[in-house]
């Protein structure tokens, strides 16, 4: 299986650089994984497709303002993008500068804060904050929302709200779980009123989600790792849902990866899970937990389009993407959504 198989040509004007005025005003492309049938809908019509007793699982991670600017002691400018918080004072980060900072060197951040370069781990730098404050407090003071590179504009105040789900709770992501951006409080209330059950997992999306796949053969790709948590109450809800013959609907690929990681860690039997996951889902994968998913449109040759292809069938997904391009759907983080049901194996 070649990475190039997952390529498609996307006109630049279909990349959404701003969100819709209202969260749920996006369009929704439905894809039946078994038949390949497509439907052009509005996102609010998702309400009609989720049945009473179904369980919707959301990722409640909170995006941190993970991009900081500063300079080295030598005066050279640099940009820091947090990959993950190690504790209240230390981060693993991507550093962009003309020359990499050396071990023990100081970094002067905007706002007068200082960090020390502690160690290098492959392409990532371990940095320690020299302050009474916590990393989160400093990020809230001087950090910028880490908009994906393809949005191709500086972050604005509005992004602090809109590049964040309404149900976010646990800070730690450096990219939004974007399928969740379409849900507002009214829609969540309408789902509950219909008898749909709602549950939350956490997966702190890392910047690795934007790293291109750099191999030709899909099987050779090494997946980045991210921290996920699937609590016992969610496991119990899933068991009840399955026992009643209802569906588990994951909102976003991060929710899919969290649930499938928990099943993988206990050899197919779903148990509570907390820890790092590097699960890589591509065609041929047998899904253990998820029956349907809400997801945005993903980048060509990305691990995310591979995951959706594993779920609904490669040919069906690539045909759906061509349809979306023809119908001028909006792509990527601030774009439109899909509702996809699983292809039977």
From Swiss-Prot:
Subcellular location, record wording: Cytoplasm
Q: Which InterPro entries match?
A: QueA, QueA_dom1, QueA_dom2, QueA_sf
Q: Which cysteines are joined by disulfide bonds?
A: none
Task: Specify whether Membrane is a keyword of the entry.
Answer: no
Q: Does the keyword Lipid biosynthesis apply?
A: no
Tell me the GO BP annotations in alphabetical order. queuosine biosynthetic process; tRNA wobble guanine modification
GO: which molecular function terms? S-adenosylmethionine:tRNA ribosyltransferase-isomerase activity
Q: Which family does it belong to?
A: Belongs to the QueA family.
What is the protein's known function?
Transfers and isomerizes the ribose moiety from AdoMet to the 7-aminomethyl group of 7-deazaguanine (preQ1-tRNA) to give epoxyqueuosine (oQ-tRNA).
Q: What is this protein called?
A: S-adenosylmethionine:tRNA ribosyltransferase-isomerase
Taxonomic source organism: Shewanella putrefaciens (strain CN-32 / ATCC BAA-453)
Q: Name the gene.
A: queA
């Amino acid at each position: 299986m070649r990475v190039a198989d997952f390529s498609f040509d996307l006109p630049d004007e279909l990349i959404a650089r701003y969100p819709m005025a209202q969260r749920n005003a996006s369009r929704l492309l439905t894809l039946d994984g078994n038949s390949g049938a497509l439907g052009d809908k509005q996102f609010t019509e998702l309400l009609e497709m989720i049945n009473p007793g179904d369980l919707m699982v959301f990722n409640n991670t909170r995006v941190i303002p993970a991009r900081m600017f500063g300079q080295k002691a030598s005066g050279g400018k640099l940009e820091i993008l947090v990959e993950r918080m190690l504790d209240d004072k230390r981060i693993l980060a991507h550093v962009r500068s003309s020359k990499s900072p050396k071990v023990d060197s100081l970094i002067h951040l905007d706002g007068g804060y200082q960090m020390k370069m502690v160690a290098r781990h492959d392409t990532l730098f371990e940095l320690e904050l020299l302050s009474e404050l916590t990393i989160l407090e400093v990020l809230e003071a001087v950090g910028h929302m880490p908009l994906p590179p393809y949005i191709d504009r500086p972050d604005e105040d509005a992004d602090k709200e809109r590049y964040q789900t309404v149900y976010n709770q646990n800070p730690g992501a450096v990219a939004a779980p974007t399928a969740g951006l379409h849900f507002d409080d009214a829609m969540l209330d309408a789902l509950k009123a219909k008898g749909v059950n709602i549950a939350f997992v956490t997966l702190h999306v890392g910047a690795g989600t934007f790293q291109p796949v750099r191999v030709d053969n899909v099987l050779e790709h090494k997946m980045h790792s991210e921290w996920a948590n699937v609590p016992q109450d969610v496991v119990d809800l899933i068991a009840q849902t399955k026992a009643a013959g209802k569906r588990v609907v994951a909102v976003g690929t991060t929710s899919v990866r969290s649930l499938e990681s928990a099943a993988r860690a206990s050899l197919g039997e779903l148990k509570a899970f907390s820890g790092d996951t590097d699960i890589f889902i591509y065609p041929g994968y047998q899904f253990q937990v998820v029956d349907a998913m809400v997801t945005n449109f993903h980048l060509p040759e990305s691990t995310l389009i591979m995951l959706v292809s594993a779920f609904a069938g490669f040919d069906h997904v690539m045909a759906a993407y061509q349809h979306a391009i023809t119908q001028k759907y909006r792509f990527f983080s601030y774009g439109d959504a899909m509702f996809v049901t699983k292809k039977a194996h």
